[in-house]
């Protein structure tokens, strides 16, 4: 088991730059809850990355809100799936990226709208599966549900039902 952990750490270390680029791309995409085009742009970026990683995806259109992204990896496993949930919207108003674009300061701290809540988590979810795939771990399926309206308590979508 220690060998697998070592291989996973190595995968993460070797992929720091692509992870950082994806994080930058997500943070620099304006996606306040009411910025539907921006939320959908984040959805498109993630969908492309997920499909490239072998994760089957589908988009659920939500009226008056951004799209919801649903993904599934390793669907053939008989074991119960793990569920990774997150959201693609932020609390930031239009123009926040122009005022505060993604950057990493001299202390290694990242800054920008949504840098932690929750765009880092979206990158981590994707790269968790990519790292598991790199060591051929296929013990359980993993499902993803990325909502578009968490910052307003899913007032426009049925995410609460889907998460339940």
Predicted regions and their residues:
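Acidic/histidine-rich catalytic neighborhood of metal-dependent amide-processing enzymes
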Residues: 118-164
């Amino acid at each position: 088991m220690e060998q697998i952990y070592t291989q996973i750490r190595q995968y993460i270390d070797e992929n720091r730059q692509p992870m950082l680029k994806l994080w930058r791309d997500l943070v620099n995409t304006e996606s306040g809850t009411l910025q539907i085009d921006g939320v959908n742009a984040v959805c498109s970026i993630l969908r492309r990355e997920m499909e490239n990683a072998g994760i089957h995806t589908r988009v659920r259109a939500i009226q008056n809100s951004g799209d919801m992204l649903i993904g599934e990896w390793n669907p053939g496993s008989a074991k119960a799936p793990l569920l990774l949930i997150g959201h693609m919207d932020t609390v930031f108003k239009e123009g926040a990226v122009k005022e505060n674009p993604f950057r990493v300061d001299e202390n290694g701290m990242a800054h920008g709208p949504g840098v932690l809540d929750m765009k880092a988590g979206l990158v981590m979810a994707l790269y968790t599966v990519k790292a598991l795939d790199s060591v051929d771990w296929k013990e359980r399926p993993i499902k993803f549900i990325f909502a578009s309206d968490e910052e307003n308590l899913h007032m426009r979508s049925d995410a609460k039902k889907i998460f339940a």
